[in-house]
């Protein structure tokens, strides 16, 4: 009886060892350190050690280092070119773009005598809302072409001051790449149009300016 129990316990112990050994072999296979792969022939030929001087490099290594330097230099040049184009576009849009003419129009309005009388010396320019949910405003500009193919730049914005509000209209013509003013006026609610200048006579022909006391008069202010 004792021998039977010993045999059974020995069998169980040996089976447990086998199971444990199987699991240990699986874990050992996962934890074994992989041998580094041997480099190929081309890798050994073109490998460029960074600690080697130029004179110590072989011809293929010199070619590899030269091509790498040229590639890095090309990336730097390309990035600098893109950055330069962005800066050029920003500068030209500020100094020669549409925003420049909006500022110029506002300065002309502030210098006009009738505009100062109607809107006061502390008049403000307010552009059109770019989005219903945004508070930022910008001058509304558009480019149009007439039947002769000539380009025109049209701008609009609001002028406020002395509890009055006016709608400013301006138009410029493209003359060999340079924009020239055609007309600039502001339409004031319950007052009429204040014409700053009209080189085309298109606005003045339709304009009937009301005097200060409501009488119909053709009065020129600040011209």
Swiss-Prot record:
> Does Mitochondrion count among this protein's keywords?
yes
Asked if the keyword Mitochondrion belongs to this entry, the reply reads yes
Question: Looking at the Swiss-Prot or TrEMBL record, what is one Pfam family this protein matches?
Answer: TIM21
| Transit peptide feature range | 1-23
| GO biological process, any | intracellular protein transport
- Transmembrane stretches, start-end: 75-95
- The residues on the Mitochondrial matrix side of the membrane are 24-74
What family, per the record? Belongs to the TIM21 family.
Q: Which PANTHER family match?
A: MITOCHONDRIAL IMPORT INNER MEMBRANE TRANSLOCASE SUBUNIT TIM21
How it assembles, according to the record, is: Component of the TIM23 complex, at least composed of tim23, tim17, tim50 and tim21.
The protein, known as: Mitochondrial import inner membrane translocase subunit tim21
State the organism of origin.
Schizosaccharomyces pombe (strain 972 / ATCC 24843) (Fission yeast)
